[in-house]
Amino acid sequence: MQSLENHFLIAMPSMQDPFFKRAVTYICEHNEDGAMGLVINQPINITVGELLDKIEIDNDKTQQAAQVSVYAGGPVKTDRGFVLHSPKHGYSASQALSSDIMITTSKDVLASLTTAQAPEQFIITLGYSGWEQGQLEQELLDNSWLIIKADPKIIFDTPVEKRWEKAVSMLGFDISQLSPEAGHA
């Protein structure tokens, strides 16, 4: 199977796992060893400013960025933060995932979020979604997910409550017409 990096996994309406129900997961890494992604539409009850206070990083509460929700990126290592952001170089642990999206895991990006040095657009997730070798491929065969090339507008410009619907609309068909069982139309 080709790499699904820089793609969205869109949870099928029949998804039973409550964590992933109506989830849109951005795939950051996918290779023969497994996959890693961040759910981009599951806000949690903490703002960026509150998170920065909790980890003792100075921040400007008057900035809109301090009021933005943090997201549950997945059930793995929920104490670890990941910042998906528009391209901005200079952070110590950044990787370009596409021409429009970078991921940074270092504290220097967090310190910049409520300043003029912040990336133009960003979301923070706590935790990530991980799949062992062959696990994601099996879930795809089991009809748990739909796949589409990622669109940064869904991550950064679409209101969180509309991200699943917007991703589904990119598929070009009515998802309610799909059979919940693999191999059946």
Swiss-Prot record:
SUPFAM superfamilies: VC0467-like. Signal peptide: none annotated. One of its GO terms (cellular component) is cytosol. It holds the Pfam family DUF179. Belongs to the UPF0301 (AlgH) family. This is UPF0301 protein PSHAa2600.
